[in-house]
């Protein structure tokens, strides 16, 4: 946090954190105007934002908070509150996390499968399905569905 590269430019400055009801948390990087959203156990789920004048970009973000699935960002330069709604992909991830936070692995599995239909390399969705299969005592019957790299530790 707050490190510099060889030229003296700041690599990142993590200035604010918000926590959602389901345990997700968002971290604001004020140098690059990016927001990183993590699961309650610290796995990066997705990121968004960036510097600029276009829609979805920020100039001088100073604060963030959750409002349901939306992330609100206070931008000092624009003197505004920018509202970011999740994409369909982000919505599915949020729903999977929310169901998992209630230990409803049956419901979460449906969301994780939809996430994998969009991005079959999303590690956390594979873990979520693994929790579902484990909960259902079907690991031996379904272990062939998990990619090998996720089975070795």
What are these regions (language model features)?
Residues 112, 146-147:
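Hydrophobic/aromatic packing residues within the alpha-helices of TPR/SEL1-like helical repeat arrays
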Residues 118, 151-152:
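Structural marker of alpha-solenoid helical repeat scaffolds
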Residues 135-137:
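Short coil/turn linking the two alpha-helices of tandem helical-hairpin repeats
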Residues 129, 149-150:
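Heptad-repeat amphipathic alpha-helical coiled-coil interaction surface used
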Residues 107, 140-142:
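Alpha-helical positions within canonical tetratricopeptide repeat
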Residues 1-133:
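Eukaryotic scaffold repeat domains enriched in small/polar residues
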């Amino acid at each position: 946090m707050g490190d510099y590269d060889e030229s003296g430019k700041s690599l990142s400055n993590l200035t604010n954190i918000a926590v959602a009801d389901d345990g997700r948390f968002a971290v604001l990087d004020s140098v690059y105007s990016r927001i990183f959203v993590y699961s309650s156990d610290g796995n990066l789920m997705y990121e968004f934002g960036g510097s600029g004048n276009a829609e979805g970009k920020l100039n001088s973000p100073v604060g963030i908070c959750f409002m349901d699935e939306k992330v609100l960002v206070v931008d000092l330069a624009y003197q505004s509150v920018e509202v970011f709604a999740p994409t369909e992909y982000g919505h599915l991830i949020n729903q999977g996390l929310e169901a998992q936070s209630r230990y409803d692995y049956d419901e979460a599995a449906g969301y994780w499968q939809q996430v994998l239909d969009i991005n079959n390399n999303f590690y956390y969705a594979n873990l979520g399905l693994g929790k579902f299969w484990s909960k259902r005592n079907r690991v031996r019957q379904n272990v062939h569905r998990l990619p090998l790299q996720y089975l070795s530790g």
